[in-house]
Amino acid sequence: MDTIAIPALNRPVDATVEIPGSKSITNRALLVAALAQGDSTLENALFSEDSEYFAKCVEQLGIPITLHPHLAQIQVSGKGGDIPAKQADLFVGLAGTAARFITALVALGNGEYRLDGVPRMRERPMGDLVTVLQNSGITINFEGNSGFMPYTIYGQQFAGGHFRLKANQTSQQLSALLMIAPYAQQDTTIEVEGTLVSQSYVKMTCRLMADFGVDVTQTDDNQFHIKAGQRYQARHYTIEPDASNASYFFAAAAVTGGRVRVNHLTKQSCQGDILWLNVLEQMGCQVIEGADYTEVIGPEQLQGIDIDMNDMSDLVQTLGAIAPYASSPVIIRNVEHIRYKETERIRAVVTELRRLGVKVEEFADGMKIEPTPITPAAIETYHDHRMAMAFAVTGLKTPGIVIQDPGCTAKTFPDYFTRFFKMID
């Protein structure tokens, strides 16, 4: 297995970095551009395993896509809600967003579409999304466990109507249904039962739909209403840098008492993970916002924090990786749903912190991390890109940290370590 040794610094980080486009926005923009009528150009698009799996699936459905990786640009020739391909065998790898978005997209088609992914993807929940589609009259045949991949969808144009959806494990199912709803045969109302996790991603979805010309009405009781007959408008669209991926660079400033500036990303971002800046401020960092950049300056000593991370759960690993350096405990709450991500993320973070000698208490929905001197170790990443990226930051403060399988970052940030080492050069 490949490994990367992280060189500990005896000085603060001082760098300005450029972050590739947001994965979440790239995938949403790609879907709505595919449904629009005409040609759209997506600038600063993310090119990674996840986004490329998604783009390939859309192209297999008969919607022309031209990728320009050197320009970070994707051109999409949308078909106005039509799915030209009547049969397709679609592979999504470990891309949960692609799995759920493509599942919804093919419901608009009139054909036979098989979806599958890697073994871990077969363990990730799809149940409520496929149940809504079945309740709308679409036939789905499961090859294994009901509600899980692989399965075949027999599309017949999504009917729309009134549906109830549980979104306590992932909000991607809700986002998928929202984005196809304008092309349903009738108005659609989606009522979310119980707690909606990662609400910030749903807000991102609604904002992007509006950017492409479609209105969503949300009531206070977590009901979403979309009128049928609305259509996305093809357009030129620039994608923000990825706030989740920026978190590791901001964390490097925090943990070394240094300075990191990320260009083209501000607190006005539509990404929920921009809330990471608030977390760092509460831990003692100074956050400076310019017209088109954000800068974090780390303190001499990080402070502990007790925080609900439900709306920024992709950052649990980032916080976990710097928490041992705080002056008091760090408590992370309300993220039970991350047990169903690329790996069982709560258990993975707890296990690797304990490997480093850190005192950690695991909860059903989070953890408590005590300030602890760290023992050097090789970090197991569990094929999870965020484990590799987060614990690389730990290595800036403590000598002897080695990241196993660093190539797993290709899922969302292929040149992460190139940019990481440039930051500390």
From Swiss-Prot:
Keywords from the UniProt entry: Amino-acid biosynthesis, Aromatic amino acid biosynthesis, Cytoplasm, Transferase
Subcellular location, principal: cytoplasm
Pathway the protein contributes to: Metabolic intermediate biosynthesis; chorismate biosynthesis; chorismate from D-erythrose 4-phosphate and phosphoenolpyruvate: step 6/7
Binding site for phosphoenolpyruvate: K23, G96, R124, Q172, R345, R386, K411
UniProt binding sites for 3-phosphoshikimate: K23, S24, R28, T170, S171, Q172, S198, D314, K341
UniProt-annotated catalytic positions: D314 (proton acceptor)
EC top class, as a word: transferase
Molecular function terms, GO-annotated: 3-phosphoshikimate 1-carboxyvinyltransferase activity
UniProt keyword Nucleotide-binding, yes or no: no
EC number: 2.5.1.19
GO cellular component, one term: cytoplasm
Cited NCBIfam families: aroA
Protein name: 3-phosphoshikimate 1-carboxyvinyltransferase
Naturally occurring in which organism (per UniProt): Nostoc sp. (strain PCC 7120 / SAG 25.82 / UTEX 2576)
